[in-house]
């Protein structure tokens, strides 16, 4: 069976997913598209040679008789309504982050999915599909380094645009760490604090950069995450787990080591899409396979809710300077196991 997918949102990430659905992945094809800018939808159909219907409204894509699953890559504030509509139609939906722009919105999706009685939602957190993170989790779960005590992490971007704001360091950048570190450790966060080092001269006037986020988990693991979105030198993701008996570190992407002119060097990537390109492929293929097999296994609506609750606390901590509690609702049995 070839899974027939409708895509809502034909911007950069939407077209990137259309590209992989059309040229890289197997078992699916795009049969319907929509974008708030109709020309973008038409351009996507032309660019990728799609035999797809262009709809004027995303809800029409969800309702289309030939659409068996939905891909939501539209503007963040529209995600909740489209995901809820897909659940109401009983159609599996892959939603790029954020699942919703508030924790309350994520909870509404959780409640709708639980009421439906079957997992239909996968959230676009791709780092759990990265080979390096998977290898790191294997080491942690094996017990080789003992119980994790501390994590030292960094999320560095070469630069960001003028529209990037201080809170986006949490909602657009740290959100990936909030998901993947919770997955690595298998436990939830209990508190967050944000501190501000000396500001880089490369940041715009309205942006606090860099920032350091301090998290604590239910078992007492302490996590520090450096967010530096104007680091200049490249795109760099770091994660070091300090255990009772040893240390495990996320590997850097493979690169050729160069010795030349009395120097030893290794190239550093500058594009986040390049750094995690394989993970994007694997996560979307997992969604396709999960729908076809009747069992989604990727990041769930509950994972989207958990990340949103933690992000809300981090934003409060940015503003208050205090240690902010992270209080989550009880996890439904539907999402356990």
From Swiss-Prot:
Catalytic activity annotated for this protein?
A: myo-inositol + NAD(+) = scyllo-inosose + NADH + H(+)
What is a single Pfam family found in this protein's UniProt entry?
GFO_IDH_MocA_C
Judged by the first EC level, this protein's enzyme class is: oxidoreductase
InterPro entries noted in UniProt: Gfo-Idh-MocA_inositol_DH, Gfo/Idh/MocA-like_OxRdtase_C, Gfo/Idh/MocA-like_OxRdtase_N, MI/DCI_dehydrogenase, NAD(P)-bd_dom_sf
Report the GO molecular function annotations.
Answer: inositol 2-dehydrogenase (NAD+) activity; nucleotide binding
GO biological process annotation, one example: inositol catabolic process
User: What are the record keywords, sorted?
Assistant: NAD, Oxidoreductase
Cystine crosslinks: none
What Enzyme Commission number(s) does the record list for this chain? 1.1.1.18
User: What does the function comment of this entry state?
Assistant: Involved in the oxidation of myo-inositol (MI) to 2-keto-myo-inositol (2KMI or 2-inosose).
Similarity comment: family membership: Belongs to the Gfo/Idh/MocA family.
The UniProt subunit note reads as follows:
Homotetramer.
Q: Supply the name of the protein.
A: Inositol 2-dehydrogenase
Q: Which organism is it from?
A: Burkholderia ambifaria (strain ATCC BAA-244 / DSM 16087 / CCUG 44356 / LMG 19182 / AMMD) (Burkholderia cepacia (strain AMMD))
Q: Which gene encodes it?
A: iolG
């Amino acid at each position: 069976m070839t899974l027939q997918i409708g895509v809502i949102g034909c911007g950069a990430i939407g077209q990137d997913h259309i590209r992989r659905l059309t040229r890289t992945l197997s078992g699916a094809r795009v049969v319907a598209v929509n974008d708030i800018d109709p020309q973008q939808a038409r351009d996507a159909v032309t660019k990728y040679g799609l035999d797809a219907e262009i709809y004027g409204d995303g809800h029409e894509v969800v309702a289309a008789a030939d659409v068996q699953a939905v891909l939501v890559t539209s503007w963040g504030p529209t995600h909740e309504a489209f995901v809820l509509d897909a659940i109401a139609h009983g159609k599996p939906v892959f939603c790029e982050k954020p699942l919703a722009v508030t924790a309350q919105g994520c909870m509404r999706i959780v409640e709708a999915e639980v009421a439906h009685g079957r997992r239909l939602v996968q959230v676009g957190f791709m780092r759990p599909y990265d080979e390096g993170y998977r290898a790191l989790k294997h080491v942690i779960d094996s017990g080789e380094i003992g119980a994790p005590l501390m994590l030292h992490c960094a999320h560095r971007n070469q630069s960001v645009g003028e529209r990037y704001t201080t809170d986006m360091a949490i909602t657009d950048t740290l959100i990936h760490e909030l998901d993947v570190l919770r997955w690595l450790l298998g436990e939830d966060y209990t508190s967050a604090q944000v501190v501000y080092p000396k500001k880089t001269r490369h940041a715009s006037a309205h942006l606090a950069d860099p920032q350091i986020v301090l998290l604590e988990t239910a078992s007492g693991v302490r996590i520090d995450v450096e967010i530096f979105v104007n680091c200049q030198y490249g795109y760099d993701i770091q994660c070091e787990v300090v255990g009772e008996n040893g240390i495990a570190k996320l590997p850097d992407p493979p690169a050729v080591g160069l010795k030349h002119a009395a120097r030893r060097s290794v190239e550093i990537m500058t594009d986040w899409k390049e750094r995690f390109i394989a993970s994007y492929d694997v996560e979307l293929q997992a969604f396709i396979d999960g729908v076809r097999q009747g069992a989604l296994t990727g990041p769930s609506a509950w994972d989207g809710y958990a990340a949103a609750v933690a992000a809300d606390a981090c934003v409060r901590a940015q503003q208050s300077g205090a240690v902010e509690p992270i209080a989550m609702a009880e996890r439904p049995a539907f999402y356990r196991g």
